[in-house]
């Protein structure tokens, strides 16, 4: 319930929320995902790779082992495994976990039975739908209204690196605007 006065604002939210905050119809299409986390006695891979499912079948899109990058990401003495399913938001947690375990068993064998499910996250707007033409991610940010900037991957190419670049562009534009218009 507090109002703050400022000269510039950066909306760093997903596309539908940005549209809502700007008072525009939230008609932005996006792709949802499920992300399941497991703790395992031993990592299934020992390298910091993103494993993509190239089979064209199954529910799993990708798998990573974040604890290979930083052991502190996992519970003490265990490995942290992250499994992503694109779409499949209609699956309840138990069904999703069962389907993932079945598929992981085909990939890594019965060792998967010893993995402990930690949590399932449902990310409604994980990736924006971006039919061509896709905006150039290297173009500097411009205000959508005086003093209001937006950033996020829906502004350019889907992916965390482009979301971060979009944020940098918005920050640089705000710094420039504030330097040019003292106030």
Please give the residue ranges for each predicted region.
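Conserved flavin/dinucleotide-binding core of flavoenzymes
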Residues: 71-183
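Mid-domain catalytic core of redox enzymes
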Residues: 1-98, 102-107
């Amino acid at each position: 319930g507090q109002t703050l006065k400022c000269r510039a604002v950066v909306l760093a939210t997903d596309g539908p929320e940005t549209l809502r905050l700007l008072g525009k119809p939230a008609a932005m299409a996006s792709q949802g995902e499920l992300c399941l986390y497991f703790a395992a006695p031993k990592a299934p891979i020992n390298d910091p790779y993103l494993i993509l499912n190239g089979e064209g079948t199954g529910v799993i899109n990708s798998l990573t082992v974040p604890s290979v990058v930083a052991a502190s990401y996992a519970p003490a003495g265990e490995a942290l495994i992250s499994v992503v399913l694109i779409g499949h938001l209609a699956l309840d947690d138990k069904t999703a976990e069962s389907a993932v375990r079945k598929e992981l068993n085909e990939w890594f064998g019965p060792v998967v039975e010893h993995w402990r499910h930690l949590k399932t996250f449902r990310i409604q707007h994980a990736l924006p739908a971006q039919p061509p033409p896709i905006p150039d991610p290297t173009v500097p940010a411009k205000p959508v209204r005086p003093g209001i900037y937006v950033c996020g991957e829906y502004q350019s190419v889907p992916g965390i690196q482009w979301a971060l670049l979009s944020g940098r562009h918005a920050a640089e534009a705000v710094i420039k605007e504030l330097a040019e218009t003292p106030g």
